[in-house]
Amino acid sequence: MADDDLSSLAPVAPAVWMFFLKKTRELADIVAAMSLCDKATPVVIAPLLIDLTVDRDFCGAVRTPMSTYEGGVLTKVTSFCPFAFFFHNTDEILDVVEDHGDVVHLCDDARRRFGVQAFSPLANRDRTDVDVLCDELGIAPAEYTGHVVCGNGLKELLYAGQLIPCPEEAVKVQVGAVDGVKVPLYPYTLFSGGADAAHADGPSAAVACDDPWVLEHGFYDPALSEALFYFMFTSWGQSLRVCETSRLIEAGLQQFVEDTQQTVKLTPFKKYHGYTSQKLTAVERDQLMTVDAVCSELAFSYASIYLDSVYEFSTASNFLEWPLVKNAKTHADLLDNLRDFQLHLAKHIAALIFSSNSILYQTRIVFVPSAGKGANSNPSAQDSLLKSIRFFNGLTGMYDDILNDAKKTIRFEGAVGRDEKYSPHHLAYFCGTSPQLFSTLMWFFNRMSIYSTGVTSGDTVFSHIVNAGSKLCGACGGRCCHTCYATSFIRVNTRLPGIPKQIKKEPVVVTLLSRAFADADLLGNYGKRYGLESREAGDGGGGGAGGRTDEVAAGPPAGGASGLNFVSVDRMKYLGQVLDYCKKNSLIDAITGEDIINVRTKRDFVATVTALNQTIDDAVCRFAMDVRRSGHGRDEISGSTQSFNLDLSPYATAFSPVLSFQYYRTMFSIIQNLALINAASYVVDNPLTTAQISKWVTLHFQSICGAFGTTPLKKGFLNVKDTKNLKSVEFERIMDFRSFQETGRYRKISTEIKSCKMSVQSLKSCRIKNRPISKTPQSSVFFKKGALQRKNPIKGCLSFLLFRCHEKLFPRCGLSCLEFWQRVLQNSLPRSVNVGKVEDFDNLVRFLLTVTDDYDESDVVDIQPDCLLSYVENRFHNKFLYMFGFRDYMSTIQGMSTRLTPQNHSQFPCLLKDAPKFASIAEYVLHFKKMKLDGVKAPQVATITREPVLKKLFDGRSLVSVSFAVEKYSSSMGTRDVFQFGQIGYYVGSGVDRSLNTGSMGTQDYRFMRYRYIIATKLVDVLIRRSRRENVMYDRDVVRSRVLAALDSTGLDVDPELAAIAELMEGRDEGDIPEIDDILFYVDQQEYIARSMYRKMRSLAERGVTDFSLASLREATATNATAAGSAAGGGGSATEGGGGGAAADESGPMYDFSALFSRRDEAEDVNAGLINGDDVRGDDEFELPSKRSRL
């Protein structure tokens, strides 16, 4: 229970710290590579990482003192914002930052154009002299950089300059390899007699402050406040559709200081954008405005509840523990690794920018009437309203006039216009007009691929760079045209999102970290046993500490109310039997799952694949019999659900400030989508009768807010954790705040500590689902399977094996694998091509045609396998579904992993070191050709490739970009409960990646409608270390499995014992021969084999063999065998005495023992219809796969 105690998870400590770190070139380079920077803006926004911006003793959640009472201090829980703001001595950081032009001027223009409120420094405040503070700390101001990290609840106080530094409590720290000092900052409320003392005169919390003591001692930096104003508060206002940022800050300050979560804060000054362009009736307008206000208020209140809570740092929060840092031998290597990681992130940035349904653009609320839905009763009216209101792309309606609280029309405050195309001003707006964020996105734009449309190509970039030499560039005046934002937009012009022409329902694209648990295989949760165990434990998926059971059991079971599909059948048992067969026969690696299949001849190929197919088909039949015995049918199978979980901790994506920026957008979107449920219910039950929206909201908000607290709990989508404080009162030695304010003297006293809340709620995860099989009687045309077309085997299910084994099957044939099989199918293969024995070749071709046609006949997955694991999974599920009458294609989740690929130098002007001065395109191209000849490394970009086994992406804790919509459905049990689930969706537009484009529609290939893509970057071995389970504790088990696989190998090209010895000796020191007892463990207690291997190893060691690789062992034993054969004339045994005996000549004729096995094959054919002793051939309910004799 101590692990769930709030007092242990969140110690009493300050929630704002100011760090001063010794300036070093290395630190400046690293911070510049990972932070949000603009060349002309002094504040740098860096990630919150241990050993980079904070020390190792830093805690991710604290109970911070907020106010005093007689004899004690009242604390409030808060977590930290996942970034650090560098504000002092940032010149060295900015010196190495790429220049992207006059971004500050662009952001100013965007504010004027779209009516965004601009920052104004506080009138009565002077900038705090940091040099004086450094002198008090005893450090030289010019030799240290300064940055501040802030708790979420105190960011408004930091903005307003109402935090008091306490140099007397400064602590020397070491952050990474850098020495420094950290200073706590306390809120002014501790020094003014507490919040209660000021209530007599009015609210105690306000941005404007006239207290002389606070004005003198409070820390205020206008540049830091400006960075907060745009990067955080303006962005939050866009998510909440609140345009007056200053009043949003005021409301946030009052909310945390005075605990006003259940009162109305935003609606009195809220303005309603994007309404006048919608064709709304008066009733629809009133409903939409009321729901808009309620959703904003609930999101603002519950963001404080969820963020001012307990969160622990993630596994990727320690910078020096990142594998990419540990693997760097030099500082230059580290910077290269960081740059490569940023390039991987570029693909996720592309998803967030180039998809027009990105979370960044979801800043508008719209009314989309449900066709054919009438309001016949209150529940139906609520459902109709719930389905009609959607959050939508804010690129539409940006110039609409505004409605105020009294529903009166106000003229738009910006520059009225009409946009036909996405521009830099739009991106600046959705960046909150933050120059640091916009400039960093330009760094990514400069390193993304150019997508040529055939009309515009790379020549456009060349022409722009050449013309930029005249210094006419409006973005930079010609000083940095190779990197400025104008060039960046020209490079990605064909990828930019379109401005929607009509309002419609769309999912939203987000980027979050995945959690380990996932039902990601083809049939998801169908036929898995864990559901029974979690339900017997009574965990329904709410807020327990068990990280696995709550995610497994979240929501009602798919596939029937009884949940029999979880209990009665075990699909994974039968699929696991096939995988065990593959491991035992050395088809796949026992640990990694990678293909290690080794075939030498055509007969070997046929025999291996035939045996594998037979194993799969047998397993399918046994599973089908198990399903029938359990009483399952098509309905239960149709209820299968694929799902995975995304981490909602603010620290999960703290390694990238860009992703932290969109994290807040995602959090607000999720809360507001859930808030629609309560808002729609109250609006239908209590129609608007007042002249002002704020009056209605004020009247009902307390009830709505209380009801919303239970709305997301155990409803299938959101997973929230409760943490309770087990101690009502504690005593700590802390600063005497009142004495310090009154006398200026610092002292610590034993103080009674109480918490404002005895329990807090924190966001844990959300669940995204996909139904592979449609439950509707008539499937869409996109899922209909047409007439079977016979495929060329090279484009069929075994193509990956044909490519891999081409050289062994057809040595020295002189044709590529693709050309060879195309000629075979066209019957145009010349006789000069050596195909080996014609009989064997004919058997191989007939076999491939038969297997390909058989696979295609039952194929409902429609994914071409590219490894044995995917082949096994696809064939197993195809056969199983075909037995139960499923003939239409299923919907599948496609995992796309990021990778880096080299590109043409000339497509990347950012490689130029100085402003370009080229007279012609030819000169430009020639310069880059010379650059290539001079050895300049080719630029790399992030591309995506399909992951054969989707589950691997989640096992490896990946960063995931995915599109989903929060769907709601009413309870069927007669209650008013509304359940939710995250339905996986699609990307809108063609700029995210060419692999996701929908260009196949004209060819009637509708796979793009059946595939649901997720873009993933594996973080294991990059930011996250492999668990000890994989690396240390089970190394012996890994070696053991590989030794046993080598002994079970049926390959004829190597002695199994030699292969086992090679596996056993790999990684051992020279001459370290294991003893018999050790070998017995590795060979599963097979004593004769252990002694034989031991004798061989000792004999080889005595002859001076030190290299125990397989090639070296074969050479050594071949030499020994030849010598022994000449001297002894064949006396002795190959196993006795370490490898003596006559050498076998495998190039000569072989014995034919096939007649010995003919009876066995016949027996297998006779028993083909029996499964566990039951004859199933006469059953009419499903079809069995045809059994083929082994060739």
UniProtKB/Swiss-Prot annotation:
Source lineage: Viruses, Duplodnaviria, Heunggongvirae, Peploviricota, Herviviricetes
Domain of life: Viruses
Localization per record: Host nucleus
Residue spans of biased composition, Gly residues class: 1127-1142
Signal peptide: none
GO biological process, one term: DNA replication
Protein name per UniProt: Major DNA-binding protein
Location of the region described as Required for nuclear localization in the Swiss-Prot/TrEMBL record: 1173-1191
Gene Ontology CC entries for this record: host cell nucleus
